[in-house]
Amino acid sequence: MSLNGRLKARAASFARTAYPPILGSLRRVLSERQLQRFILVCDRLKGWLLKEAVVVPSPSPMALPPWIVDEMKALARIEPALYPSAAKLRVFTSWKAPIDNGPAQLYRGCLADFIEYAPDMVFLVPHLQRGGADLGILHHVRLCAEMGVKVTVVVTRDVVSPWLNRLPAEVRVVEFGRLGNLLGEEDRRLVLLRLLLQCPARSIHIINSQLAWELLERHGKTLMFEGKRIYASVFCDDLDGNAIRCGYASEFLPRSWMHLAGLLSDNRTFLQQIHERDGIPPELMHWLYFPASDHAEAIPTAGSTILWASRISPQKRPGLLYEIALALPEYLFEVHGEVDPACRGETQRKLRRLPNVRLHGRYDSFQALARQGRYAMLLYTSRYDGLPNILLEATAAGLPIVAPDVGGIAEFLNTETGYLVGADADAGEFARAIRSALGNPVETARRVKRARELLTRRHGWAAFRDAARKIPGYLPGGVRPEQEVSMETEPVSR
């Protein structure tokens, strides 16, 4: 390198070091226009110094498109630091949008069960765990499989489902929530929508799935346009910690019922409430009383032990159970059920302190509990409900029942079939009903007999199948979609 070149190199090195602090100082004293002129002069000087000071490689293609360079030049009149000098342009590199293969992988993982299997019916459910609604899912899926309907069950939550093994062997299961657990909610919705649109199934049944209800609300019209018949099951409203009504029927149904081909429930009372408060057409509504266990048998009862079998959660009012047990020290209360996290503190400790209460944890089969033969009756204390399956199982086992008049319970339990107390009954009223049931064995036996007759007549498998076939378009060989079947709207007899 010549002497002139070496001098220019030293000057360029000095300029690189001194330029930032000088520019910072000048920003405090110069106007924007003066500062802009200084930067332009420095850029020209830098180009002259570096021309011989460094070996410039052959120019490479510009990473930035020309229109961006032009905009930077225009913006430099306002902010001189944005001027697209050669040095500034060299720091830019090519950029490509990141590719997220997650949705594509989820879609590909579900293709076999949605497309290749070619199901006739798709069930969208949150999980299959121990519970009445989950048992209802099993009833619906079993009925479809029994009638030759090809079924795909889509589990939309990322949770363990211990009851998956109860599904018929020929049913396909997609654990959608677990497969897509790394995706965002919108990606999961869009992948599921694409699968449902491309799936040959004409019927879709939503049962308690948050993701499915969101999909119905946002894309129900699209699914309808593609010829999908969408059915949804609702059982009761929920109540939050402030006793405010919530749940799928409150949050989604008023905005999405128009996309449904049918609204199903296990009780008639709740459907009437929805019709009265939201104005949903009664011809859209269908109630199907769930069947009792196929292996139901009456089991002789003895003693004075009271069975309480429910999930220990705020809905089931374990605090009320505590007050009832406190008021009836002469009776033993055996409590079976998984403890909700909300009740693992003081509520659980209070129950353990009572000498006439025994906590046994969760159970898998009510019939297995009843076969022990040591229970005199079932106590049910739910705050809100549909038509609880446990009442059917207890009746099948020959147990008398004391329960509150909430949800659809009065459709099964009344003064002829059990001991019904008011929805707002306190511990004293429950205690009086329990004493009446256990203190009058002849009358109690008569009511149990009537309850079992009702169970046989209305809650058999054939009755469930016949009711499902009356839902327009739901099952092959049933009522055609163009035929109307209206829900009777007179009050339920109690």
Map each language-model feature to its residues.
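A conserved mid-protein helix/loop that constitutes part of the nucleotide-sugar donor-binding site
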Residues: 134-139, 304, 313-327
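Glycosyltransferase donor-sugar binding loop
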Residues: 155-160, 332-346, 359-361
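Non-catalytic membrane-proximal stalk/linker segments that position and tether the catalytic domains
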Residues: 20, 24-120, 479-494
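Nucleotide-activated donor-binding/catalytic signature segment of Leloir-type glycosyltransferases, i.e.
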Residues: 172-176, 345-363
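Conserved acidic donor-binding segment of nucleotide-sugar-dependent glycosyltransferases
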Residues: 415, 419-427, 436-441
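A short, active-site helix/loop in glycosyltransferases that binds the activated sugar's phosphate group
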Residues: 77-82, 215, 243-247, 251-284
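Short hydrophobic beta-strand element within catalytic cores of glycosyltransferases
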Residues: 400-403
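Aromatic "clamp/platform" in nucleotide-sugar-dependent glycosyltransferases that forms part
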Residues: 383
